[in-house]
Amino acid sequence: MPISCKSRCGNRAALKRPKTGDALCKECFFAAFEAEIHHTISSSNLFRRGEKVAVAASGGKDSTVLAHVLKLLNERHDYGLDLVLLSIDEGITGYRDDSLETVKQNRDDYQMPLKILSYEELYGWTMDRIVAQIGRSNNCTFCGVFRRQALDRGAKLLGVDSIATGHNADDIAETVLMNILRGDTARLRRCTDIKTGGGEDSIPRVKPLKYSYEKEIVMYAHYKKLVYFSTECVFAPNAYRGHARAFLKDLEKVRPSVIMDIIYSGEQLRFKDTVKKPVRGICTRCGFVSSQQPCKACVLLEGLNRGLPKLGIGKKSKGDRMIAKQNQELALRERANLVKNDF
């Protein structure tokens, strides 16, 4: 016997929402999904009227749905935003080159300007070349650090007020688990924040899909017939995040609400005043925001350029110590020159 849509619209149910278990028709699902994102945006004051917002676009399901929904809500609720697409080309053959074609399709479909920046032009390296140097064990460290800074660089070039990323509820729950397992209190503090960064020296990042389940994002893209790229990064299978994702999926089988439970728990965490907070400043080399001197991107890049790519790996790597020592020696030489010039 056909099941009726729970919203009592008179239509037959076409799906069951993973988040609530409600049986809904497609139109009611679209309305509920979009309304929840609008509530997230408005209740968290993610944007202000007249702002220019860069949508971090990879061509995947999350960024494609984010671009589609932001354009829709911007028009429906008159946010008054100037939306642009910002994409980073890491230089991964057979993955990013193909996904960028989808990003260009997004540009045409949503009539948004698109800016593409590559690791090659920013750092002089592609991920293919980096992996050839270091192997596959730590490639996500390089890619993650470079990508975060590349988005900042692109946002600065575009003159935007904020960057909207496609992080969904599953991503955030996985990150909470990863930071707990690694004992990374610095990242654990801010990984559930819906808005990060900001201030005089950095461009804020916002997560409009923070409370949206990955399964529902896939369903929305499917029923809306959105064009997106679904191939996984060729280097991703070795990522540490994969273990957290598998663990989360196992937990979800026995407790369907576990994703939101973990996010809410992460939001409620409190740390003792004695726990040191990393102080964010400006990297003296590249001029971008960092919690260390020099920034991690500069440390990793220095290792690559010296032919010692693993120098920057680890919480307090050999590369960090080497560069810190060089900075100390440089400061001593400058001080000695000042004293010499005084005579």
UniProtKB/Swiss-Prot annotation:
It comes from the Eukaryota. Its EC number is 2.7.7.-. It is found in: Cytoplasm. It holds the Pfam family zn-ribbon_14. SUPFAM superfamilies: Adenine nucleotide alpha hydrolases-like. Disulfide bonds: none annotated. Transmembrane segments: none annotated. This is Cytoplasmic tRNA 2-thiolation protein 1. It comes from Drosophila ananassae (Fruit fly).
